[in-house]
Amino acid sequence: MLNPGCYLSSGIGLLTGSGFTPNASWTAKLTGTKQIGTGRIDGGGRIRARFTAPLYHGTAGTRTLTLSVTDGPHVASTTFQLTPLTASFGPRTGDPQTLRVRWRVLGLGPNHGVYVHYVAPDGRLKKTLRIGTTHGACGVLKTGPIALFPFRYTYGTWTFQVDANHTYSARTTPRLLIGFEIRRPSRGRGPSGGQTG
């Protein structure tokens, strides 16, 4: 079996198994691919090895893959999920004073708090907001409507860093960055804002 059961591209996990031929060699492969790993079975017929997930190819959604391990006469298979790391909110434009959005996050793993770190146009951290807790093997979060700017903002381009750390660091991994520009009022209209990129 594999632990955990869901991975980002090149994520690291643990492959374990039992009931194989003691002291024999094992090989592993993904369905439709060549061999991806080999090793030696211990004297009790057990396998314990590091697993590196393949690269995720696509733009959205999880994929289910099958990993097979064999020592020749015995074959064991297990499935796991491969996911992208995504974060988004909608609507993507509106008056920042009143804009309420629904966040969608995928890929941070199960049972993690999800945090949005608000980096102001001057590059300084303004606020960190916890928006919920992930669930499921791959870490899914869907929020109800919440204020996008629950504090006084300044004009310019903000950066939202989304990650699973309650403390902000520009070096946190994994993380996602989303830009949001707030424009000054003009021609009798109030301030407006919209996601960039």
Model-based region annotation:
Residues M1-G197:
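Extracytoplasmic/secretory-pathway segments with low complexity and glycosylation-like composition
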